[in-house]
C-alpha cells in the first residue's frame, strides 16, 4: 500500500509557476511565485505550506511546482528551508513580494502616480534579477548591477515608508549580531543620506534641474565635452576642412586643440568609414573653465580648392588652396556648467559665411558671437553634446558607449589643473598670429601662404610631427589659410608640434612665405619670398618661452636659406636682435651675414606642454648642480620660487638631486637646512590639490628609489633645531610648513634608518632612538608653551603628528611611542586647542598603536580623562562623540587583544557622563543620535561582570547609586518614548531595545538586592523602574502584530518577543514588592493596565492577576478598593480610546479576575460587581472605538451617548463631561446645532449659580475662562443660546435666556449683558412669528441581525430627519452607512430567523409625532406659535395602517375601514442630545371608521383655518395653494360631496348597529357644518386676490360653494364666524383653533393616517398636504389579494388621467397660472388623492412625485362616479379627494396645520417610490428587485492522491498570467 513519504533534501523547496485554486479543505491554493516548503510527496502530489503563510498546510499538484536548491536546517517539526539563491537574489525576491502587496493597495486607492512609480521599480528589479540569475555578466558589470539593485531597493523602501536596509561597502545586508553598534549607526546614517540624495535627484529631475549633477561636475577635477558631429548642411562645392574647437569669447582665444573632419565636395566625410562615427571628446577641462564667463563651441570651415569659387575654367586654375569659407558658433556655457544635459538632443549650429575675401575667420567668429541671430538660410551643423566627468581614462571606462578607441581626443591647450603622473607629454602649440607683407613689385597685395615645418640643425625636415587637429593624421608641413590680396593677414591658426624629447634641443620651427596665384601657370613660377624660424631650445638649456614671438622675416635669396646652417646662427626674433645691439624697428633692410632682413613682419605664439622639458633655469640649475657647485645655495633657495608644475614634472630627479647634495656633504651641515627646506617645499607642493595625484609617485620614490642611508640623522637634527627654535620669528613659519610635511619627512627618516639597518645591521640603534626621543621631547616641550607665537605650529603638530605613528613604530618601541603621545596630549594647556587635541586623539585611535593591547593600556586612561573633562564642560561635543565612537569601535573588534579591562575603564569613567550628556541634550540636536549610539555601545559591550562591578564603583555612597539608577531610568524612558532615530531605522532601534532590555534587567537585580528591604526601600526608584519597564513594553517598535508577517518573523527570529521577556520581569518585580505594594496604588494601575492590554495572550494571562493583587492590597489596607476602581476606570477609558484592548482582553479580564475574586473570602461579591462593571464599560468603549474613525458620525454619536450614559450611571462626572464634549463636537461637525445645544445643556445642569470654585474637570475647554461655577454656567448658557439660535429653536433659547436674565438682573447686576440678552430675546420672539421653519420628518428604523454592532442590534430607533429630507433620501443615507445591509420590504416586526441571522436587515418607515401642547397653549393661539410643538419636544410617535373588519361593502368602503395605530415612545424627547432615540415602549390601538372620519374632518377644517389665517397675516402669500385647497373641497367633481360619510354613518341602520356612536355622529355633523364659514372666508380672500386669468376658475368655485353651502346649512345647521378675522389677528378666535378640537379625553389617541399608503408620505412630498379627503367607493379590488393592484388597471388609470387632462379646456387656463409642478396627481386605494401643493415643503418636479398608483392599498373612485356627473364640468385636474382619510402627509407625516410654511424650492432629485407603510407582511412596492442568483456551484474537487493531479493549464502570455495571479497590470 502506497503512502505519503517525506521528501528528499533536493525536493524540499520549490516555486509555483502557475495559479492553483484549492478544491477541497485539504488542498492549498497557490499563486504564481509562491515559494513552498515541501514536507511529503505522494503520486504526483506534494504536501507542505507556502512560506508566506506557514500556519496553513495542505496538498497541491507536484506538476505546478518548479524545484529549487535550498539549505535544509533542523529535522521533523523544526525543519526549515533557506533558499540557496545569492543573498541579493533573496533580498530582491522578498522586496518584490512586499512591494507587490503595496502596489495592489495603491491601485485600489487610485493613487496613480505612486502606482506607476512602483510598477517601474518592480519591472526594473525583475529584469535585473533575471540578469543576475543568468550568470552571464562579467564581474565588473555584476558589481555595477548590484549597486543599482540595492540603490533601487533602498529608494523604493523609502518612498513606500518601509524599513531602511543597511549594508556594507559591497552592498550586502549587515548582520547586527556581527556589527558594532557604532558601525551600525554609521551605516544607517550613510544609507539614509544616500536615499535622501536619491530622492532629491528624483525631485530635481521632475523640475528639470539637476543640482547634484552640477555639484558632481564641480567636484570632479577633470571634465570632458563629448561631441558627435551628425551632419554638415552647407553648400560648399569643393572639399573642405571642418575644424571644431572650444573658444573663450571674453579673452578671444581658443582653449582647446582642433577636432578636424575632412569633408568632401559630395557632402560626405572624406573617410566614408566614419560616416556615422564622427565623435570627439574635448578633455582636461577643469574648475577654472567652469568659472569662465562664457565658452563657445566654434566650427571653422576652410574650403580647399580654387582661389575663387566663381571661376569655372578649372583646368587653368590653381587647386588645393586653403581658403576661408565661414564659421558656426554655439554657446555651450550651460552644458559645460552641467545645467543642461541631454545627450540625445541634436543641436543645430547656424552657419555664417565670410562676407568678403579679406574677412578673417577670427573676426567672423567674434561677429557671430556678438550678433543676436544668424541669417543661416538653413545652413549649419548638427551635433550632440554631453559633459562627462573624469579624465580620458575614466571616461573610456565609464562611458564606453560614447567614447571608444576610435573617438578623437582633443586636449586643452595647456596642462590640466591636475597633472597625472603617468601623463607623459611633449607638445608645443604653435599659433600663426598675423603678418604684414609688402606688395613688392606687384600692383596689389600678395596672397600670402605660410608653410610651417620642423627642421633639425642639419637642415633635415622632421617628418610627421605636425598635427593640424585631433582625428587627423600627422603631417610634415602645414599650410595656412590664404587671404586674397591682404597686406596684413591675421590667421590665428594653431597646430600641435610633437617632437621626440631627444630631438628637441636640435630642432627649430621654419616658416616660409609664398605668394599664391589663382592661375596655375603663374602659381608654379611663384617662389618662396621670405623665411622665418625659431629654435625650440634656448641657449641656457630651457625650452622656448610661452607667449608671442615677433619673428624676423628674412628675404629668401636663391638657395641660401635652404641650408639651415646659414640662418641658424642668426637671431630669430626681434628680441634677440635687440639683445645683440641691432635695431628691430628700422625700416631699411638690414643685412646680417649673408641674409637680408625683410621689411615684412610675422608674429607667432607658442605654448609648451611638456613633462620632460623645463622653461625654468633655476630648476635646471639644481638638476645639474654638479656642473656649478658655487651656485648651489642660490639654486636651492631659488627652487622654492619655481612653479609647482615644473617641479612635480621632475619630481624624482629633483629629490635625487636634493638627497645627493645631502649625502655628498655628509660631514658638513652647510646645505642641510636648505635641503630640508627644499624637501618641505616639494612635500607641500604635492599636498596641493593640483598635484595631489603625485602623492603615489612620492610614496613609490620613498619605497623603491630613495637610497640615502644617512638622511635620517640630518633630517631629525634639522627638525629638532626647528622645534627648539619654535618661538623665533623666522623659524616659526618654516616649522609650520615642516609640521604640515611631517608624515613624509618621517617616512624618509624611517626608510633611511631601515636602509641603514639593512647595510649595517642595527648599528647606532641607541643613538637613533635617543635622537627620536630628543625630538619628541622637544615637541612635547613646545606643546606646553603658552606663547601666542607657537599656537599655529602647535595646532599643526596636533594635526600632523599622529600621521607618523604607523611608520615610526617600525623603528621605535610602540609603548614608548604611546607614552610620548600621552605626554604630548597632556602638555597641551587646558582650554587651548581643544578641538585640535580631540581630533589628534581620534587619529591616534585610528593608528595601529591603539589596536595593540599594551599601548591601549597607556593611551586609554588619558583619553577617557580628556573625554570626561570636556564632556562635563559640554565642550566640542562633536569631536568628543567621534573620539568615543572610534574607541568603542576598536574595542568591539576581535583582533585587538583583550578588551574587558578597557570596557571597564570606559564604564567607570564615562558611562554616567555620557548618560548625563544625553539627558541634557535636546532632541533637535544633531549629535543626539551619535551620543545615544555611544551609550548603547558601552552598555552592549559591558558583560555581567561589568554590571556587578558598576555598583562597587559608587562605594558606600548609597545616594550615588540611587541617583545613577534614577538618571538611567528617566533617560531610558525618554529615549523609548521619543526615539532619537527615525522610524525606518528598524535594526538600530531593535539593537537599542535589546541592549536596553538587558540593562533594565541588570538594574532590576540591583533594585532587588539593594533597595527592597524596609530600611533601604526607595519608592521613587521602584516607581521609575515600573514606568520605564511598561514604557519599554508598550513602545511602538515592539508591537509585532502591527507588522507584516515577514517582518514579524524576522524580528522574532532575531530578537524574540521582548515584550514577554520584560512583562514577566515586571510581574516578578511586582510580587517581590510584598508589603510595599500598597504604596504603588493607584499610581501603578495605569501602567500595569497598559501592559496587560498588549495583544499577547501569554503575557495577558501572566499579568492580569496583578489587578486582583492590587484589589487585595487596597482592601486589606482600607477595607475597600475604591482608589483602584476609580483609577482603572479612568485609565481604561484612555487606553481603549487610544487603540488598545480587544474582545479577547475583555473575556480574559472577566474570566481571570472573576476566578480570583470568587475564591476570596471578602472580595467575592464586591469583586464580581466590579469586574462586571468594568466589562460593561469595556463593551461600550470597544463599540465606541470601533466606530470612532467610522465615516458614519451617527454611529459615533450613539456610542458616545452609550458611554456617557454609563459614566452618568456610575457617577463618574469627569468622564461624563469629557464625553459630553466629544458628542458636542460631533454635532457641530454635522451642523446639528440644536443637538449640540442640548448636549452642552447637560453640562450646564451640573453647575450651580454659585461662587463655588470650578474644579478642573468641569472646565473641559480652554475657551472657558471661568473660576467659579456661576461664571462657567453663564458662559455655557451664552454658547447654548447661540446654538439654539442657529438651530432655529428660539423657544428653548428664550427659556434659557429668561433664567440668565434673572441672574443678570437680580444677582450679577450686569445690565449691559442684560440689555444685549433682551435684544436677542426680542429677535427670537419675532423669528418665531415671522420666520418659516421647515418641519422635519420622523422615521422609525429597526436594526435586525447579528451583523450589527451591539449598540444597534435588535433595537428600534426614532430618527429626526434633516430639513427637507424625504424618506428615500434618509433611507439612502442609512444604507450608505451600512452598505451590506438589506432593506426589509415589510413594516411588520421581523421573525427570529431574521433577528438571529448573521446578516444585517434594516426596516425603515415614516412615523408621525404626537402633539403634546404645553397647558398654556390650551386657548386660541397663533398657528406659528403652535406649529413648533407639532414636531419638537415630542416623545410619542404613531404609525397607522388601514384594516378591514366585517363584510365588504362595495357601495361604501369607509363603513368598515378601521385604522390600526402603533404608538412608539422614545427614551427621551426629540430633539435632544441625539437626532434619534431608542424606542422604549410600543403599544397598539384601533380607530373605528367613525372616529377616523371625525379626525379627518377635524384636520381638514384646521387646514382651511390655518391657511386662511396665513393669508390674513401675510397678504403677499401666493394664492395657488389656497386655490387648490378650496377647489378640492367645494367642487363636487373633485370630492363628490359628503355622500360617503352620509352613506356610511348617517343612516338609521348604522345607528341601530352602533347606538353608542350617536354623540360622535353629531360631532361629525357639527364639523361638516363648521366647514362652511371657514370655506366662505377662504373664498372671500380668494376673490380679493384672484387674477383676471383665473377669474372663471374662481367664479365656478363660488358656484360650487353656493350649492354646497345650501345643502349643508339645510341638513346640519348654520354656523357663524366671530365678527372679523382681521380684527382678531393678534389673538385668534377660539373657533379657529380649539372649537373643533375634541377634548383630549374624547379624541382618539392620534390622527389616523392612510399615510401608510406610502411610508414616504412625509411632508416633504409634493402635494401631500393642503387638501381634504372625501370618502368614496373603491374603484376595484383585485380578486387574488387585497394588497395587490392589477398592472393593467394601473396603466388604464394613467391613461384615463391623461385623457381627462387633455379634455379640459379650463385645465389649460389653470396651468398657465399654476406651473406644471404645482399639481401632482396621486391615486390611492380608498381615495384618489388630489393634493394641493404643500406650503410646508418645496415644490418638486413631477418626475419626483411618487407613483402612488402603484400601491394597491389605495382607495380610488371611478371617473364616472355619480357625484361627478351631477356637477358642472370641472376646472381642476381629475384627481379626487376624500374626507374619510388623510393624505399620506396626514397619516404618518404632519397634520394639515403644517401648511403654514412656504419654504424655497429644493433642487431636483430623482428617486424611486417605496410604499411600505400600508403593507402587512407583504413586499413593498417599488423598483422590482431581481431574485438572487443561485448559489455558486463549486466544481467537483480534483482527484486526491489516489489519482494523478490535474495537469497545469497551458502557458499564457505574461499579461494573462499577471491577471490570473491577481497582479494589476
From Swiss-Prot:
Primary localization: cytoplasm
Region (Interaction with NCK2 second and third SH3 domain (minor)): 1793-1819
Residues modified as Phosphoserine: 1681, 1743, 1751, 1756, 1761, 1764, 1858
Residue ranges of every copy of the SH3 domain listed in the record: 9-70
Domain DOCKER: 1207-1617
Record domain C2 DOCK-type: where: 425-609
Annotated GO CC locations: cytoplasm; cytosol; glutamatergic synapse; guanyl-nucleotide exchange factor complex; plasma membrane; postsynapse
GO MF annotations, alphabetized: GTPase activator activity; guanyl-nucleotide exchange factor activity; SH3 domain binding; small GTPase binding
Region Phosphoinositide-binding: start-end pairs: 1687-1695
Region (Interaction with NCK2 third SH3 domain (major)): 1820-1836
Biased composition (Pro residues): 1824-1851
Region (Interaction with NCK2 (minor)): 1837-1852
Compositional bias of kind Basic and acidic residues: 1680-1694, 1705-1716
Residue numbers bearing the Phosphothreonine modification: 1767, 1772
Positions with biased composition (Low complexity): 1639-1666, 1756-1766
Subcellular location: Cytoplasm; Membrane
A Pfam cross-reference name: DOCK-C2
Composition bias type Basic residues, residue spans: 1695-1704
SUPFAM superfamilies with a match to the protein in the record: ARM repeat, SH3-domain
GO BP field: apoptotic process; cell migration; integrin-mediated signaling pathway; myoblast fusion; phagocytosis, engulfment; positive regulation of epithelial cell migration; positive regulation of substrate adhesion-dependent cell spreading; regulation of postsynapse assembly
Domain text: The DOCKER domain is necessary and sufficient for the GEF activity.
Family named by the database record: Belongs to the DOCK family.
Subunit structure: Interacts with the SH3 domains of CRK and NCK2 via multiple sites. Interacts with nucleotide-free RAC1 via its DOCKER domain. Interacts with ELMO1, ELMO2 and probably ELMO3 via its SH3 domain. Interacts with ADGRB1. Identified in a complex with AUTS2 and ELMO2.
Name of this protein: Dedicator of cytokinesis protein 1
Species of origin: Homo sapiens (Human)
Gene expressing this chain: DOCK1
Amino acid at each position: 500500500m502506497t503512502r505519503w513519504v517525506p521528501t528528499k533534501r533536493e525536493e524540499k523547496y520549490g516555486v509555483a509557476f502557475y495559479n492553483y485554486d484549492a478544491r477541497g479543505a485539504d488542498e492549498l491554493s497557490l499563486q504564481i511565485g509562491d515559494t513552498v516548503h515541501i514536507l511529503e510527496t505522494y503520486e504526483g502530489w506534494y504536501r507542505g505550506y507556502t512560506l508566506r503563510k506557514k500556519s496553513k498546510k495542505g496538498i497541491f499538484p507536484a506538476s505546478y511546482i518548479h524545484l529549487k536548491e535550498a539549505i535544509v536546517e533542523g529535522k521533523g517539526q523544526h525543519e526549515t528551508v533557506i533558499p540557496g539563491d545569492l543573498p541579493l537574489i533573496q533580498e530582491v525576491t522578498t522586496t518584490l513580494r512586499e512591494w507587490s502587496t503595496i502596489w495592489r493597495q495603491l491601485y485600489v486607492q487610485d493613487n496613480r502616480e505612486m502606482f506607476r512609480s512602483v510598477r517601474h521599480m518592480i519591472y526594473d528589479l525583475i529584469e535585473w534579477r533575471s540578469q543576475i540569475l543568468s550568470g552571464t555578466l562579467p564581474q565588473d558589470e555584476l558589481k555595477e548591477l548590484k549597486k543599482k539593485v540595492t540603490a533601487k531597493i533602498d529608494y523604493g523602501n523609502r518612498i513606500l515608508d518601509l524599513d531602511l536596509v543597511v549594508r556594507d561597502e559591497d552592498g550586502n545586508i549587515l548582520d547586527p549580531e556581527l556589527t558594532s553598534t557604532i558601525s551600525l549607526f554609521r551605516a544607517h546614517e550613510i544609507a539614509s543620506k544616500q536615499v535622501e540624495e536619491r530622492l532629491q535627484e528624483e525631485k530635481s529631475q521632475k523640475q528639470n534641474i539637476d543640482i547634484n549633477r552640477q555639484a558632481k561636475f564641480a567636484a570632479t577635477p577633470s571634465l570632458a565635452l563629448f561631441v558627435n558631429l551628425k551632419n554638415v548642411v552647407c553648400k560648399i562645392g569643393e572639399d573642405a576642412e571642418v575644424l571644431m574647437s572650444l573658444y573663450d569669447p571674453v579673452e578671444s582665444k581658443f582653449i582647446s586643440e582642433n577636432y578636424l573632419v575632412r569633408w568632401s565636395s559630395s557632402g560626405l566625410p572624406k573617410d566614408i568609414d566614419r560616416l556615422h562615427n564622427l565623435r570627439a571628446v574635448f578633455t582636461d577641462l577643469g574648475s577654472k573653465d567652469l568659472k569662465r564667463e562664457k565658452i563657445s563651441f566654434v566650427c571653422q570651415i576652410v574650403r580647399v580648392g580654387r582661389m575663387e569659387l566663381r571661376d569655372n575654367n578649372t583646368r587653368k586654375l590653381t587647386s588645393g588652396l586653403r581658403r576661408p569659407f565661414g564659421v558656426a558658433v554655439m554657446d555651450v556655457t550651460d552644458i559645460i556648467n552641467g545645467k543642461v544635459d541631454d545627450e540625445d538632443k541634436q543641436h543645430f549650429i547656424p552657419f555664417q559665411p565670410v562676407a568678403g575675401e579679406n574677412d578673417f575667420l577670427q573676426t567672423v567668429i567674434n561677429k557671430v558671437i556678438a550678433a543676436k541671430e544668424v541669417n543661416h538660410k538653413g545652413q549649419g551643423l548638427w551635433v550632440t553634446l554631453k559633459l562627462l566627468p573624469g579624465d580620458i581614462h575614466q571616461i573610456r571606462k565609464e562611458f564606453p558607449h560614447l567614447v571608444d578607441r576610435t573617438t578623437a581626443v582633443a586636449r586643452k591647450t595647456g596642462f590640466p589643473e591636475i597633472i597625472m603622473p603617468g601623463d607623459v607629454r611633449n607638445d608645443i602649440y604653435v599659433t600663426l598670429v598675423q603678418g604684414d607683407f609688402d606688395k613688392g613689385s606687384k600692383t596689389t597685395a600678395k596672397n600670402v601662404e605660410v608653410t610651417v615645418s620642423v627642421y633639425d640643425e642639419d637642415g633635415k625636415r622632421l617628418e610627421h610631427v605636425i598635427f593640424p587637429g585631433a582625428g587627423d593624421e600627422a603631417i610634415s608641413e602645414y599650410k595656412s589659410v590664404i587671404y586674397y590680396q591682404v597686406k596684413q593677414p591675421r590667421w590665428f591658426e594653431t597646430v600641435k608640434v610633437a617632437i621626440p624629447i631627444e630631438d628637441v634641443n636640435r630642432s627649430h620651427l621654419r616658416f616660409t612665405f609664398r605668394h599664391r596665384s589663382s592661375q596655375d601657370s603663374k602659381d608654379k613660377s611663384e617662389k618662396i619670398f621670405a623665411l622665418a624660424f625659431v629654435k625650440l631650445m634656448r641657449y641656457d638649456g630651457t625650452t622656448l618661452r610661452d607667449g608671442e614671438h615677433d619673428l624676423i622675416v628674412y628675404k629668401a635669396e636663391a638657395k641660401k636659406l635652404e641650408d639651415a646652417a646659414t640662418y641658424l646662427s642668426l637671431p630669430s626674433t626681434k628680441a634677440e636682435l635687440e639683445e645683440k645691439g641691432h635695431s628691430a624697428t628700422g625700416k631699411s633692410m638690414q643685412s646680417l651675414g649673408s641674409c637680408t632682413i625683410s621689411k615684412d613682419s610675422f608674429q607667432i605664439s607658442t605654448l609648451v606642454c611638456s613633462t620632460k622639458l623645463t622653461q625654468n633655469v633655476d630648476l635646471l640649475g639644481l638638476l645639474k648642480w654638479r656642473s656649478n657647485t658655487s651656485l648651489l645655495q642660490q639654486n636651492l633657495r631659488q627652487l622654492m620660487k619655481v612653479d609647482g608644475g615644473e617641479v612635480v614634472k621632475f619630481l624624482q630627479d629633483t629629490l635625487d638631486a636634493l638627497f645627493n647634495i645631502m649625502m655628498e656633504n655628509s660631514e658638513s651641515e652647510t646645505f642641510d637646512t636648505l635641503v630640508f627646506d627644499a624637501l618641505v617645499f616639494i612635500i607641500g607642493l604635492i599636498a596641493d590639490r593640483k598635484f595631489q595625484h603625485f602623492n603615489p609617485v612620492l610614496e613609490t620614490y620613498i619605497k623603491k628609489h630613495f637610497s640615502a642611508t644617512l638622511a635620517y640623522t640630518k633630517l631629525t637634527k634639522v627638525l629638532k633645531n626647528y622645534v627648539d627654535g619654535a618661538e623665533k620669528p623666522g623659524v616659526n613659519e618654516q616649522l609650520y610648513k615642516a609640521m604640515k610635511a611631517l608624515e613624509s619627512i618621517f617616512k624618509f627618516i624611517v626608510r633611511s634608518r631601515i636602509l641603514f639597518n639593512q647595510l649595517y645591521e642595527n648599528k647606532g640603534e641607541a643613538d637613533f632612538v635617543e635622537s627620536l626621543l630628543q625630538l619628541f621631547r622637544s615637541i612635547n616641550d613646545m606643546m606646553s608653551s603658552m606663547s601666542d607665537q607657537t599656537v599655529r605650529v602647535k595646532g599643526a603638530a596636533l594635526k600632523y603628528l599622529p600621521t607618523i605613528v604607523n611608520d615610526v613604530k617600525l623603528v621605535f618601541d610602540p609603548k614608548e611611542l604611546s607614552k610620548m603621545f600621552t605626554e604630548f596630549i597632556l602638555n597641551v594647556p587646558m582650554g587651548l586647542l581643544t578641538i585640535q587635541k580631540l581630533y589628534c586623539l581620534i587619529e591616534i585611535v585610528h593608528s595601529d598603536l591603539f589596536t595593540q593591547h599594551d599601548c591601549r593600556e597607556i593611551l586609554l586612561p588619558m583619553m577617557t580623562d580628556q573625554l570626561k573633562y570636556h564632556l562635563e564642560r559640554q565642550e566640542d561635543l562633536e569631536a568628543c562623540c567621534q573620539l568615543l565612537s572610534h574607541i568603542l569601535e576598536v574595542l568591539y573588534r576581535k583582533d585587538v587583544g583583550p578588551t574587558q579591562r578597557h570596557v571597564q575603564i570606559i564604564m567607570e569613567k564615562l558611562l554616567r557622563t555620557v548618560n548625563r550628556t544625553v539627558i541634557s541634550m535636546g532632541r533637535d540636536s544633531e549629535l543626539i543620535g551619535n551620543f545615544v549610539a555611544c551609550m548603547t555601545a558601552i552598555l552592549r559591550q559591558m558583560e555581567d561582570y561589568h554590571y556587578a562591578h558598576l555598583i562597587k564603583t559608587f562605594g558606600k555612597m548609597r545616594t550615588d547609586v540611587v541617583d545613577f539608577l534614577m538618571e538611567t531610568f528617566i533617560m531610558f524612558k525618554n529615549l523609548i518614548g521619543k526615539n532619537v532615530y527615525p522610524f525606518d531605522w528598524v535594526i538600530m532601534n531593535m539593537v537599542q531595545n535589546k541592549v536596553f532590555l538587558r540593562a533594565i534587567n541588570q538594574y532590576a537585580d540591583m533594585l532587588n538586592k539593594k533597595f527592597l528591604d524596609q530600611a533601604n526601600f526607595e519608592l521613587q526608584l521602584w516607581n521609575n523602574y515600573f514606568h520605564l519597564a511598561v514604557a519599554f513594553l508598550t513602545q511602538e517598535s515592539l508591537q509585532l502584530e502591527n507588522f507584516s508577517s515577514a517582518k514579524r518573523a524576522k524580528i522574532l527570529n532575531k530578537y524574540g518577543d521582548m515584550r514577554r521577556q520584560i512583562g514577566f520581569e515586571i510581574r516578578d518585580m511586582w510580587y517581590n514588592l510584598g508589603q510595599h505594594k500598597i504604596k504603588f496604588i493607584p499610581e501603578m494601575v495605569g501602567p500595569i493596565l497598559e501592559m496587560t492590554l498588549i495583544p499577547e495572550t501569554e503575557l495577558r494571562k501572566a499579568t492580569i492577576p496583578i489587578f486582583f493583587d492590587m484589589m487585595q492590597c487596597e482592601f486589606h489596607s482600607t477595607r475597600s478598593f475604591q482608589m483602584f476602581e476609580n483609577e482603572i476606570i479612568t485609565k481604561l477609558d484612555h487606553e481603549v480610546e487610544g487603540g488598545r484592548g480587544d474582545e479577547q482582553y475583555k473575556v480574559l479580564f472577566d474570566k481571570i479576575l472573576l476566578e480570583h475574586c470568587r475564591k476570596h473570602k471578602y472580595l467575592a461579591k464586591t469583586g464580581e460587581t466590579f469586574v462586571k462593571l468594568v466589562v460593561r464599560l469595556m463593551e461600550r468603549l470597544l463599540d465606541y472605538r470601533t466606530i470612532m474613525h467610522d465615516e458614519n458620525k451617527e454611529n459615533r454619536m450613539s456610542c458616545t451617548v452609550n458611554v456617557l450614559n454609563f459614566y452618568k450611571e456610575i457617577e463618574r462626572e469627569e468622564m461624563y463631561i469629557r464625553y459630553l464634549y466629544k458628542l458636542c463636537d460631533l454635532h457641530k461637525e454635522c451642523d446639528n446645532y440644536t443637538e449640540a445645544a442640548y448636549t452642552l445643556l447637560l453640562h450646564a445642569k451640573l453647575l450651580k449659580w454659585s461662587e463655588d470654585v470650578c474644579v478642573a474637570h468641569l472646565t473641559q475647554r480652554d475657551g472657558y475662562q471661568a473660576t467659579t461655577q456661576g461664571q462657567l454656567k453663564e458662559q455655557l448658557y451664552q454658547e447654548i443660546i447661540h446654538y439654539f439660535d442657529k438651530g432655529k429653536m428660539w423657544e428653548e433659547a428664550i427659556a434659557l435666556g429668561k433664567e440668565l436674565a434673572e441672574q443678570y438682573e437680580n444677582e450679577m447686576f450686569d445690565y449691559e449683558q442684560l440689555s444685549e440678552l433682551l435684544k436677542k430675546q426680542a429677535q427670537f420672539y419675532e423669528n418665531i412669528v415671522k420666520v418659516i421653519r421647515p418641519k422635519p420628518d420622523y422615521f422609525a428604523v429597526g436594526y435586525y441581525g447579528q451583523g450589527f454592532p451591539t449598540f444597534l442590534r435588535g433595537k428600534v430607533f426614532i430618527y429626526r430627519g434633516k430639513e427637507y429630507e424625504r424618506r428615500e433620501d434618509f433611507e439612502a443615507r442609512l444604507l450608505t452607512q451600512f452598505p451590506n445591509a438589506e432593506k426589509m420590504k415589510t413594516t411588520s416586526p421581523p421573525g427570529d430567523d431574521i433577528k438571529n441571522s448573521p446578516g444585517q436587515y434594516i426596516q425603515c418607515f415614516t412615523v408621525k409625532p404626537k402633539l403634546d401642547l404645553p397647558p398654556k397653549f390650551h386657548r386660541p393661539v397663533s398657528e406659528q406659535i403652535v406649529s413648533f410643538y407639532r414636531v419638537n419636544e415630542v416623545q410619542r410617535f404613531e404609525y397607522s395602517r388601514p384594516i378591514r373588519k366585517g363584510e365588504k361593502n362595495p357601495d361604501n368602503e369607509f363603513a368598515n375601514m378601521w385604522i390600526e395605530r402603533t404608538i412608539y415612545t422614545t427614551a427621551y424627547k426629540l430633539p435632544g442630545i441625539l437626532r434619534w432615540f431608542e424606542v422604549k415602549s410600543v403599544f397598539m390601538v384601533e380607530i373605528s371608521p367613525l372616529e377616523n372620519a371625525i379626525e379627518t374632518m377635524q384636520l381638514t377644517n384646521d387646514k382651511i383655518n390655518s391657511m386662511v389665517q396665513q393669508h390674513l397675516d401675510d397678504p403677499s402669500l401666493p394664492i395657488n395653494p389656497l386655490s387648490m385647497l378650496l377647489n378640492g373641497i367645494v367642487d363636487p367633481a373633485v370630492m363628490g360631496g359628503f355622500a360617503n360619510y352620509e352613506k356610511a354613518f348617517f343612516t338609521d341602520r348604522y345607528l341601530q348597529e352602533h347606538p353608542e356612536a350617536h354623540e360622535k355622529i353629531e360631532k361629525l355633523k357639527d364639523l361638516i357644518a363648521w366647514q362652511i364659514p371657514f370655506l366662505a372666508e377662504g373664498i372671500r380672500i380668494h376673490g380679493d386676490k384672484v387674477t383676471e386669468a383665473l377669474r372663471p376658475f374662481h367664479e365656478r368655485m363660488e358656484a360650487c360653494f353656493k350649492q354646497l353651502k345650501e345643502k349643508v346649512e339645510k341638513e346640519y345647521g348654520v354656523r357663524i364666524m366671530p365678527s372679523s378675522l382681521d380684527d382678531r389677528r393678534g389673538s385668534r378666535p377660539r373657533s379657529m383653533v380649539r372649537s373643533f378640537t375634541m377634548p383630549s379625553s374624547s379624541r382618539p389617541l392620534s390622527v389616523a393616517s392612510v399615510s401608510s399608503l406610502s411610508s414616504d408620505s412625509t411632508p416633504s412630498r409634493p402635494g401631500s398636504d393642503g387638501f381634504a379627503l372625501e370618502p368614496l367607493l373603491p374603484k376595484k379590488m383585485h380578486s387574488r389579494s387585497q394588497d395587490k393592484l392589477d398592472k393593467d388597471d394601473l396603466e388604464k388609470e394613467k391613461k384615463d388621467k391623461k385623457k381627462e387632462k387633455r379634455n379640459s379646456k379650463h385645465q389649460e387656463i389653470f396651468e398657465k397660472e399654476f406651473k406644471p409642478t404645482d399639481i401632482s396627481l396621486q391615486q390611492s386605494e380608498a381615495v384618489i388623492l388630489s393634493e394641493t401643493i404643500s406650503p410646508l415643503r418645496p415644490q418638486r418636479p413631477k418626475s419626483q412625485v411618487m407613483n402612488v398608483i402603484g400601491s394597491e392599498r389605495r382607495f380610488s373612485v371611478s371617473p364616472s362616479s355619480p357625484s361627478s356627473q351631477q356637477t358642472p364640468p370641472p376646472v381642476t385636474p381629475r384627481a379626487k379627494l376624500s374626507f374619510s382619510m388623510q393624505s399620506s402627509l396626514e397619516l404618518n407625516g404632519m397634520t394639515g396645520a403644517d401648511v403654514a410654511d412656504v419654504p424655497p424650492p429644493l433642487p431636483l432629485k430623482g428617486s424611486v417610490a417605496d410604499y411600505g407603510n400600508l403593507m402587512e407582511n407583504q413586499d413593498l412596492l417599488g423598483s422590482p428587485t431581481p431574485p438572487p442568483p443561485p448559489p455558486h456551484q463549486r466544481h467537483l474537487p480534483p482527484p486526491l492522491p489516489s489519482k494523478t493531479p490535474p495537469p497545469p493549464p497551458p502557458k499564457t502570455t505574461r499579461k494573462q498570467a499577471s491577471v490570473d495571479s491577481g497582479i494589476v497590470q
